Amino acid sequence: MKKDLKTLALARLSGFRHKTVRVPEWENVSVVLREPSAEAWYLWREVLNDGDTGDEPLSVVAKTRRNLEADVTLFCDVLCDTDLQRVFTADDREQVLVVYGPVHARLLRQALELIADAEAARKK
C-alpha cells in the first residue's frame, strides 16, 4: 500500500538525512544519527560567540572548553535511539560535557558527514 505524501513528509526525521550505526564501545548498540537541526546550529553559534568580547583574546583553555561545549550542543541534537527519538535534550548538555570523548566526537563527525553527503549530491 502506498503512503500518501503528507504522511511521508510528517514522519519522524523525514526532514533530516539520517543513518543507523553500531557503537562497539557501547555494547555494540545501534543508534540513529541525524543531521543537526537549525536550532542546534543556532545554539552552536551562540556557544562559540559566548565570551568573545573582542577586547581580550580567549586563552587556549577557554577556547578548548568553548569548542567542546559547542560540539556537545550538536551531539545532543544528533543522537537518536532506534525509535527515532532524541536521546538528549538541551538540559542534558552539562552531563554529556563531563563524559564527552572520542566515541562521542566520532559519532558527531558521522552525523556532520550526512551534510557533506548532501552537498556532494547537489554537485552531481
Regions found by a protein language model. Give the residues of each.
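Extended acidic low-complexity intrinsically disordered regions
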Residues: 1-17
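Short acidic-hydrophobic surface loop/beta-edge motif
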Residues: 17-27
